[in-house]
Amino acid sequence: SATPEFPHGQYDKELRDKSVNFKGLRGIRNYDITNPEKPELLEEYSTGVKGNGTHHNFYDGGKYAYLDCGWDDQLRMENHQRPYSNAIMIVDMSDPSHVKEVSRWWVPGQRFGEEAEYKKYIFAGDRTSWTGNHGALTVPKRVEDGGNLGYGGFGAFGMFVLDLSDIAHPKPIGHVQYEFNALGTIPFHTVYPVLADAAHPRLQNMMIGLHEALEADCREVYHTPYMIDVKDPRNPKIVGLFPKPQAPPDAPYNDFCLARGRFGSHNSQCWLAPGISKPEIFAAAWFNAGVRVFDISNPTAPKEVAYFVPPHEGEINDYESWWRGSTENCFVEFDRNLIWIGTHEGSYCLSCPALGKPVLEPRKVDKWSVAHCNVGWDESTPRAFYFGGAGARPASA
């Protein structure tokens, strides 16, 4: 990343050399956490001796893991933050002690040498845009259970829908970009699937595309998350935009652009969470604007219903202490109606009226928000409870 010492980020040779010559693991580590107090390392899996390794992967305990992965030095990156970009690597996790690569996919034009394809994009050569994957591939239904679609955010390239029917050869079948895309930021950072049942018909087949702000103090065009209708996976459509958070009335600034640090969305609540999801409620970390909670029951007009802005520490003359903003992550416990956030100054546990009365006592997780992750979790609950029909009891984990 750009710093006062290296203001041009990867375009400063000294910083770039440090990054590309890193000697540590580029890949993933798998652990057995049967005993959470003593995790046991099963394997260190290298995705390549060059490139970025992995960053923000998707794995729900099934056969396959979807890695946000840079496996070599041929995946181009315009933005100053990294020397190379990432794409998708799918690996077989059947034996977590012996991971096997299944396939790779990247946007045509993303690799050096694919110049004709790359030059079709307006941002080619701008040294600003994020030209790669950032949040791996979200696969709402496991391939081994009959699922065949994955949704991935590829920065300035947009969101791609991949057909995984032949998982050894993923194929793009759908694509969407925001029509007012601008230089900078990560327009499509991650893609979050809304978990909606028949009681919430307007939210079925909906995805939320999150962007990530990159530059402090709004030194780039502001982006906002998008509600995306994927009923037709070959023709995904942006149908709604999230409102821009406003500064609290008692804040010493009237706009978050003046609050120091990054202003914009980053990571959202986790897809897999304790309890039964409340599909109309969505929470996301917003850097210097804290955590924001939205009512998305009308997907064409998401509405903010709550926020929490934690203290933002840092010295005004110490760029490294404030440039990222503060709030990076959030996690919702639907069974206890709690929101956890991770910030650079510490972690917070929050309640929110939109979720309901908080439960502060520890409790065992009876069920998870994603149906297929409950199989094997509780042997006393029939499979039909999660999947309908007259299915048998889940096999033990």
Map each language-model feature to its residues.
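Feature marking well-ordered beta-strand scaffolds used for ligand recognition
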Residues: 1-397
